[in-house]
Regions:
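Hydrophobic h-region of N-terminal signal peptides that target proteins for export
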Residues: 2-9
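Predominantly the C-terminal beta-signal and adjacent terminal strand-loop region
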Residues: 51, 55-62, 112-156
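Solvent-exposed loop/turn segments connecting transmembrane beta-strands
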Residues: 22-34, 66-68, 97-108, 136-145
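Primarily recognizes Gram-negative and organellar outer-membrane beta-barrels
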Residues: 11-26, 58-63, 91, 96, ...
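Gram-negative (and chloroplast) outer-membrane scaffold detector with strong preference
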Residues: 39-117, 154
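Short glycine/proline- and aromatic-enriched beta-strand/turn motifs that initiate or cap beta-hairpins
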Residues: 9-48, 78, 83, 145-149, ...
């Protein structure tokens, strides 16, 4: 049994064919919510995926509450999984990337650490590079500003 346990190694990114799922908290100015993402490895250091989040708690603006469209976001993304490039422990991965969403074209930087082969934690920060609307005001700032995500990561 001891030999079998020692052969199990947690690995944050395995390369082509690797599938990751993440769920966590989304934190941004005047709003907090839930974050989901999925990534699929297409090469040794590349993955494509999606993210979505929904703000559960938002600040009223001029007495109005944010509606579903203000609270929801969906993005397609590309990651460069660089843990092995930086010679990090196999349990760790650093992944900068680009994303194209409902509100902007942006960039993100994330970090994963796996405790077991199936479970780990992640943190990720993102910001818009180009907003689709130059006159952003009120609820348009939601999901269109600096965001921070933190939570659990899973090998699927």
């Amino acid at each position: 049994l001891l030999c079998a346990v020692s052969l199990i190694q947690a690995q944050a990114y395995k390369g082509k064919g690797d599938i990751k799922g993440q769920v966590g908290a989304n934190l941004q100015d005047h709003g907090t919510g839930i974050f989901f993402s999925g990534d699929y490895g297409v090469g040794e250091n590349m993955s494509f995926g999606f993210t979505t989040n929904y703000l559960l708690n938002t600040t009223e603006i001029e007495g109005e509450k944010a509606d579903f469209g203000d609270r929801f976001d969906l993005k397609a993304r590309f990651n460069a999984n660089l843990g092995n490039v930086f010679k990090l422990d196999k349990k760790m991965d650093v992944y900068p990337g680009l994303d194209l969403g409902l509100r902007n074209f942006g960039a993100h930087l994330g970090f994963r650490y796996f405790f077991t082969d199936g479970f780990g934690i992640f943190s990720e920060a993102g910001l818009p590079i180009a907003k689709y609307d130059e006159d952003v005001y009120g609820f348009d700032h939601y999901n269109n500003q600096f965001v921070f995500n933190i939570g659990a990561s899973f090998n699927l």
